[in-house]
Amino acid sequence: RSAKEALKLITTMIGEYGQGGNCGFHKAFYYDNAFLIADENEAYVLETAGRSWAVKKAGEVETISNCLGLRADYEAASAGVSGDFRRAHQNHLVTAVAGAEKRRAASRAVLSGEGEPFELMMKA
């Protein structure tokens, strides 16, 4: 099996069935998902929102962390998606409360070798 096959399966299922369900403990809380899909030859970043999705080939360093990162730089998307995917779909309150942007930046810095892993992660 390949990353392309996994990508096709996930996007087909999201388009057909949607995703999610209540993941809150005491109240309703829903969020969308992102995936890093890889095999020995290639890798993809897939971000989703409801039944919508956008994907691009992964660069040398990629991270996901409870926030959308694809702007208009995706290579393929579900029907009806155009422009800035993040701007159209990101829940800014959830992203801020979760500290997602800081955590994503810290994990990217660690993977890029831009600092001491423990110090960077403690700042996130």
Regions found by a protein language model. Name each.
Residues 20-22, 31, 62:
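Short alpha-helical interface elements
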